[in-house]
Amino acid sequence: MRDYAVIGGGHIGREIAGFLSNEGSCVLVDPNRGALNQVSSVEKIKGTVETNPEILSSSNVFVVALPGKIAKNTVAKLLKDGRKVVDVSFYQENPFIFQASVPANSVYIPDCGFAPGLSNIMAGYLFTKFDTKRIGIYVGGLPAEPRKPFLHSVTWSVEGLIDEYIRPARLIKNGATVESDPLGKTFNYQPRGFMKLEGFYSDGLRTLISTLPVQDLFEITLRYKGHLKNMKFLKEMGYFGDENEMSPRKMTERIFSQFNDTHDVSILDVISLDRKEHRIELRDYGDDHLTSMARLTGHTAAITATLLTEYPEIRGFLPPEELGKDEKKMNHILNELRHEGVKIEMT
């Protein structure tokens, strides 16, 4: 019996597999031989859980790192088979669609990446520790040295980047869930130790909308000044549209994808905004070999997978913020990230 199986051999999946191979036995599963060949220290299987059903019975914990369009079917199959699943994939539907599908002897942790994921864990901690009723999440994955005119870089997915600018952002305001046009309003914010940035409401709260009974809750995604003005212009001009036979969006994605420097910086500030303020602040930098975004996304999922091995009693549908409500588990995750060189401060 292997300790871990990572489903999906993209750059996030490969990073997860590399981390978990140092924690126990691990196999990486992907139908693309080229993706598998980029990893040398991990057992590899070419295929899927559908074409290689023996994987289901030969691994303890599964980490799904697939594109959202195909992740759902894989997750459904794993849960139907009663497996423990950590899911870093992002899909449009509410993760609660799987709540009723989780057998009593299995576990499903959705949205377990950087943001959503680590941001949820921190928010769950602040909510439980300080009984806070107002939480703000400020998050950004930025190039260390922005290039004009884009003033940004694609550290995750170019499709996901554009989606952030067109998908209505859900937030909680005065106890009610509301939607906001992401580019309808911009904010100024200066992270500690960093230059002043601008931000916009983004739709990254996910399960937090349903699990935290607070008065105010929002996520603001950060950008260098000038970027959002450019994005608003492109959106209004129709460059994010996908309705025509010759898609303006596809052309825009191709242009944006040229800005992909690995030297990025990740910022995450999760703040209780009650009368007495409490903050968790994270800073991390990419290098020649790996983006910070890939490290934080992959390692958050991988560390969470190790928790399922360490705490076999964990069961059921478990949004990431539930881990944050347990101070011991939350500290374990943050300390493991600190061990990887991620700077995290709590005040």
Q: What does each model-identified segment do?
A:
Residues 5-6, 28, 64:
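Hydrophobic Val/Ile/Leu positions in short beta-strands of Rossmann-like dinucleotide-binding domains
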Residues 24-40:
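NAD(P)-binding Rossmann-fold cofactor-contacting core
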Residues 88-110:
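Rossmann-fold NAD(P)-binding glycine/threonine-rich loop
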Residues 13-14, 71:
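N-terminal Rossmann-fold NAD(P) dinucleotide-binding loop
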Residues 46-58:
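Short acidic low-complexity segments
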Residues 61-78, 92-94:
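Beta-loop-alpha module in the N-terminal Rossmann-like domain of NAD(P)-dependent dehydrogenases
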Residues 129-347:
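C-terminal catalytic/substrate-binding lobe primarily of soluble NAD(P)-dependent oxidoreductases
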Residues 9-10:
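Glycine-rich Rossmann-fold phosphate-binding loop(s) that bind the pyrophosphate
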